[in-house]
Amino acid sequence: MTGRDAAVRLADEALAGLADAAARVPGARVPGPRGGFGLLGERGEVVGEERWTDRSCRLLRTADGWIAVNLARADDLDLLPAWLDLEVGVQESVWDRVADAVAGRDAIAVVEQGQLLGMAVARVPAPEEVTEGDVQLMSRRMVPPGGSHVRIVVRPPAVTPPAATAFVVDLSSLWAGPLCGRLLAELGLHVVKVESTTRPDGTRLGSPEFFGRLNGDKGHLGLPLATAAGRAELRRLVSRADIVIEGSRPRALAQMGIDPAAVVRARPGVTWVSITAYGRTGPWCQRVGFGDDAAAAGGLVDRGADGAPALVGDAIADPLAGVVAAAAVARAHADGGGVVLDVALREVARVAALRAEASTAAGAA
């Protein structure tokens, strides 16, 4: 089984779970049969396969392994001098220079240096590595059989039946969180996408059709989150929500004056889902990550005959985490809420990677 096959199967299971949960919510639209393959490759379907020739993430060899480097943002290039003491000329290949610079360095050290600068860089674990030695997974109790997300019970579930008219506030951006919100909107829930008026969702800079697919069935609200008044309005909106979707690192939420557990504790039936690269807790909770590098950090890569890793799919941890999160939210809502769900792209990818490795080992036995 390839990494992509394992990811598709995990997405299929999540979609089935989403439908089962919807059937327990009075008035919700129960989705018909749907495969995960299409959702995981949806962006490529919309924007075309030519994007593969110039993707922002590469897997690069270091002195003792491999790392994923994702230069997805325009200002990432400005950080290269501080990260690698590297100046890139106009006529030079950025990737050739970066590859040369990391080739003689220790993978863990170069990743830590990049992350301190806010760069989306990650070490790719070797197939034989024991996950029980991973400090982030151990701190989050996500070593086997840890599962695909952390579920924290904050208060007893609501006594009143869940409603299909639930109010969902979607604070997320890019792919994973918006996909989660879209899948909930398809059940009939009222989803409102909230964006900063000064820093809107970065997906708007890409394909309008893809942005529309993720967010077309939602209401939209822009708030001046750089102002105290805008942040106060955001807190009022969140306090009215039955479900909140967000993808911010813990530090960013705290700066907004928002505590997920406090929001859930304040009112019966509330479900909060956080979808981040490495999770809300643990020593890596403030690390930056996107779909490709987070998947590689979870070991969800394909390997050639020489053992060299290759990226799987298109930012595959993003849509996979979005589907897993939607199923988890639907189950929690059907059960009466009262929980904070913590979904990490890396951990969702890791579940698929472990399945692929187990299948390969079984086939070789």
Descriptions of predicted regions:
Residues 282-292:
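Histidine-centered active-site microenvironments of extracellular/periplasmic hydrolases
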